[in-house]
Amino acid sequence: PYMKVYELSAQVMVEGLKELGLMKGNAEDAVREGAHALFYPHGLGHMMGLDVHDMENLGELWVGYDGQPKSTQFGRKSQRLAIPLEPGFVHTVEPGIYFIPELIDLWKGEKKFMDFINYDKVEEYRNFGGIRNEEDYLITETGARRLGKKIPLTPEEVEALR
């Protein structure tokens, strides 16, 4: 299911934040507990069709969750797609990382996830803002095909656009 892809993307992000000293502890535990959502307060992607957010008026439970229970955990509850991917599906993959001062202040004040978040180090990044990478994919019989050109991801690739 796509929820597993979301969890893996969150774990990869946590590992990167650990390298910067912003997070600590076991990445899988941090994601399970919801500590990653300080930086990743949204889902990983959604299905596309005739419209960008196709069929959302029907309700996410019936489109992206097929009637299964949806998480109520902050961050995870914003994931719009949890069903197994099938050939022919078109969906977005849009991981991101944000530093939201109000959310940082709230969680720090509540001493939330102190075992996973180094709030002193987070303060150094509080005015960074955020970034989100969005690419669209077609699910095929053998995997997935990116729709459109590869976007620059590394600092070197981004700087080369100048």
Predicted regions and their residues:
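Active-site neighborhoods and metal-handling regions in enzymes and metal-associated proteins
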Residues: 1-162
